[in-house]
Amino acid sequence: MCIRDSIVSDVRKTGLAIILTEILNKCINNFEVSPSLYVHIKKMIISFEHHDFNPVFGIFFVKEILHFFGINPQNNYDEKSPFFNISNGRFESKKDDFLKTNFPHKEFHQLLGMNIDTIFDMKLSVDKRREILALLLEYLSYHEILNQKQIQSVHVLQSIYD
């Protein structure tokens, strides 16, 4: 397979790329970003082209850009702090009212620890991917980086995940 054609020739990758572009566009329009963000995005796109499709990449991509907007979640998950808190951006002892009771906190913790070299090996169920994506979009919205209601393509992303 030609590396340059993999995103355009794989409908799943194309759909995911369109959705991530929309999310990124909405975030960048609200903030002045550094050139290092573009370097990081380029690295992620190249890696996305080189690997087989994995729907977890979309969630990973959104997680990776958080740092560039100054809201990188703290990965302090443990037995005493098993619940992620959107407003504080860290795991805490009490459940956050923003999140569903069955939110996959442990899997979110695992995602936060992943890097571009390991993300393509991660597997998550459809429901867990949806919950984590919803959390990340809510997190961006809570911190006023993204108006989640403006994102039109999330339903398309969910159909790709199924």
Which sequence ranges carry the predicted segments?
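Non-catalytic alpha-helical scaffolds and adjoining flexible linkers that form interface surfaces
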Residues: R4-D162
